[in-house]
Amino acid sequence: MEENIESVEEWVNKLDIETTKDIHVPKLLFDQVIGQDQAGEIVKKAALQRRHVILIGEPGTGKSMLAQSMVDFLPKSELEDILVFPNPEDPNKPKIKTVPAGKGKEIVRQYQIKAEREKRDRSRSIMFVIFSVVLLGIIAAIVLRSITLIFFAIMAAAFLYMAMAFNPVIRNERAMVPKLLVSHNPNDKPPFVDSTGAHSGALLGDVRHDPFQSGGLETPAHERVEAGNIHKAHKGVLFIDEINLLRPEDQQAILTALQEKKYPISGQSERSAGAMVQTEPVPCDFVLVAAGNYDAIRNMHPALRSRIRGYGYEVVVNDYMDDNDENRRKLVQFIAQEVEKDKKIPHFDKSAIIEVIKEAQKRSGRRNKLTLRLRELGGLVRVAGDIAVSQKKTVVTAADVIAAKNLAKPLEQQIADRSIEIKKIYKTFRTEGSVVGMVNGLAVVGADTGMSEYTGVVLPIVAEVTPAEHKGAGNIIATGKLGDIAKEAVLNVSAVFKKLTGKDISNMDIHIQFVGTYEGVEGDSASVSIATAVISAIENIPVDQSVAMTGSLSVRGDVLPVGGVTAKVEAAIEAGLNKVIVPELNYSDIILDADHVNKIEIIPAKTIEDVLRVALVNSPEKEKLFDRISNLINAAKIIKPQRPATPATTRAGNNAA
């Protein structure tokens, strides 16, 4: 049973706080994740056992926070520094060595000190030789009384200096210093590396191009090696969001790294000098957390997914949570967290908390639920805070949150507002009077953008009936860039108006136009509107233009629930309509802002008959239509299944016989 919880206003006013400043914000990141209890427990188990995880869910539901929180539960293991050394036998195959965390810097420093000492000794030797040559030249010039000998001695010293200073063999000391690829301090937490959107070089490692490849000017191969994110995540967590957007080759490389726990670094560009360099396998023992939306699995490498399933977990995160006391407290904690993280906005008072919770109810799109698309809700919190700061307030109030909702409307809502104004000016839909075959349908835009906020629009639908070109060859013609689901919805609806009108439509062409749908129409939520417009056109019964409607329709005439019903009702209010018909099952899902309450009559409908009774204008034709519908209902017979005979009854009958 659903929990009967008090209104948001009553609940918030009972809280023993003045502002969100009085709310305790947990220090542990895991405890800051809101509404993902089941996913959180699985992620925690995965971290303790070093298992891989796939997190699937809508954007902004806490997938990256769950992944990042895993580092707090990873078993304590010794972090390692990774160094790359030159290979005297094969310069293009540098050697790899791992040492305990913090030791890598010491080793590199020791090699640098050794190289500097050898460099100083070499410099002293060179200077000694040069001075000796010059001194011998001066002595020879004095003995032989020839000044030119001094000139030749200086020239010889100069050539000798250049030969010794730039000799590749002598310069080899610098080339022998190893490079530190991955460095840690002894007390560091396990690394968390976000590799979302990383290219191949950043993900798998790369070898930089060397423009000077010969003549003693080249950079040693090991100094050009760069660690990839898979190596930086060694002994930690590698997080990749939108895993399906990675190239198949990169996904295959990650699979290899998961299997072998090491992966060599090579040049990623075949046109680079680094393409010829490949290191020894570099350790990359990481926990992979792959995340994505619901379509991520479709384009994910099957072998990679199989590997994760075999050695880890697949988790679908929640999009909403129950609207109860515990979860409301979590939402208040979320507001406090956002204020603490931002550090630039004031805390929220009780009136502002009420508005945020109501917005969470509204964005969930379902009764007795709260949205978990908290990234977008956090955006509302920050905008409200900015408004309060601009007005030099010390706390955020309800007025600031309401202003934020108007100021930070999604792009689709801003476009829809302008579209409604244009449609009103040019009268592409009407808000009063009655017209045959014309219905004010309702639709949403932004449903395919990944945003949690739907934007409602009025969708005029016009139907007209004409004689078919050929006898018995009537067609249903729908225009307006309909998608596949919308086209199928038109065919399904045809069963309804064939049944209700009782007329042979084989000699009719039924034209259905979705007015002004330049961006196209998809979905079946206009089914009720289509049926009403067509029945109106066939029966010549006007439709009340102050009524809007939405709802899907079964082939038997039942009105089925649809999405975005609150946004659609708001669109009807903004358009100035008086009534809106919604599916009965969606009626309790509607949550309106205070400025929209009591501005429109909301009528729930269970069947198409309920819709027609409200939408069609009273007339003799309407009475005839409903008499016909009544006869159809009375003529329907319900066959009850016979109860099968029990063994006892059968035996009794046999005995009686």
Curated annotation (Swiss-Prot):
PROSITE patterns (alphabetical): LON_PROTEOLYTIC
Molecular function per GO: ATP binding; ATP hydrolysis activity; ATP-dependent peptidase activity; serine-type endopeptidase activity
Top enzyme category: hydrolase
UniProt keyword list: ATP-binding, Cell membrane, Hydrolase, Membrane, Nucleotide-binding, Protease, Serine protease, Transmembrane, Transmembrane helix
EC assignment: 3.4.21.-
InterPro entries (UniProt xref): AAA+_ATPase, Lon_arc, Lon_proteolytic, Lon_Prtase, LonB_AAA-LID, Mg_chelatse_chII-like_cat_dom, P-loop_NTPase, Ribosomal_Su5_D2-typ_SF
Pfam families: Lon_C (PF05362), LonB_AAA-LID (PF20436), Mg_chelatase (PF01078), Sigma54_activat (PF00158)
GO cellular component: plasma membrane
Keyword Cell membrane carried by entry: yes
Outcome, altering D241A: Retains 5% ATPase activity. Proteolytic activity is greatly impaired and cannot be stimulated by nucleotides
Sequence similarity: Belongs to the peptidase S16 family. Archaeal LonB subfamily.
Protein name listed in UniProt: Archaeal Lon protease
